[in-house]
Amino acid sequence: MSTHFQTAVKKRVSHTHRRDAIDRLIERGERTNLALLVRTSGLDGEFRRYALNGLAECNGREQLEELADNTTIEPSLRRRADDLR
């Protein structure tokens, strides 16, 4: 796991630092880690959606397809993944 991923999932991280960490994942094209953030149920929905949108930015079509079909994540996230792919 990258340092940026670890920052994104830590419990006591400021909103700004968490968003910055997700931005770094997007910039580096870390699609697997972004998809994992979307699946992380302990993470606020705002950040899960941000990671989902980041997948679209870094051409994560394969991950978006997988997330759209994944029944273990919230239906709203699945619908958004389907829209983005």
Predicted region positions:
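Structural detector for internal amphipathic alpha-helices that build alpha-solenoid repeat scaffolds
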Residues: T7, T16-R28, L36-R39, E46-G60, ...
